[in-house]
Amino acid sequence: MVCHHKGMTTDFFVDIWSDVVCPFCYLGFRQFHDALDLFDNAEDVVIRHHAFELDPHAELTHGQSLNEMLAEKYSMSLERAAAMNQRVEDTARELGMEWSLVDARPTNTFNAHRVIALAATHGLQEAMLERLFRAYFSEGLVISDHDTLGTLAHEIGIDGVDEMLAGNQFVDAVRHDESLAAKIGLTGVPALILDGRVHVSGAQGSSAMLEALEDAWSQRSQQTA
């Protein structure tokens, strides 16, 4: 699962684990790319996205809203859950994104990750990931629905999703990503590993992301000096 940012001379891998229904993953996605725009060595960056399921046992069709699910999961009032989601929406708006979490439909994300893996074979991994983020957080689409996944993939130039989902393609790829996360000890997302040496957890902001990129590059330079 690889996305080349630009033409590279020396690969500087950035491995990112995320789930498409994780708000902080979408925030972190945008923050990382804002940081990358300011990183002097961005042309050497190779982005590798990896699958992570926050709830592998989530149902395909979920009757609860995101607010209701959050309230139940953390034993809080519906009003408090709504207020928490509003704060997240406000943060997204500061990054130029318009979310509607009241319309978000919690669902299983395994097949969405398979579609992202398919997109990677076309060099469209990040485009697919971002499209799924937007579908879930801004458009209230059910991103486990096969027709929806096929439509979203077609929008960015990928066909054959129905046939892929009917079989077992990319099942092993998703499971491999999740096994690797467990082996590394990752328990939450977003999780970034920069050049195999600097770890970043959570959506810490573009400034922190840029600092981490520069730190990893500095360590790399010292090692090769």
Residue spans of the language-model regions?
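C-terminal cap of thioredoxin/glutaredoxin-like
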Residues: 3-17, 24-41, 49, 116-225
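Short intrinsically disordered, low-complexity coil segments enriched in acidic
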Residues: 1-2, 90
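Structural alpha/beta surface segment adjacent to cysteine/selenocysteine redox centers
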Residues: 29-136
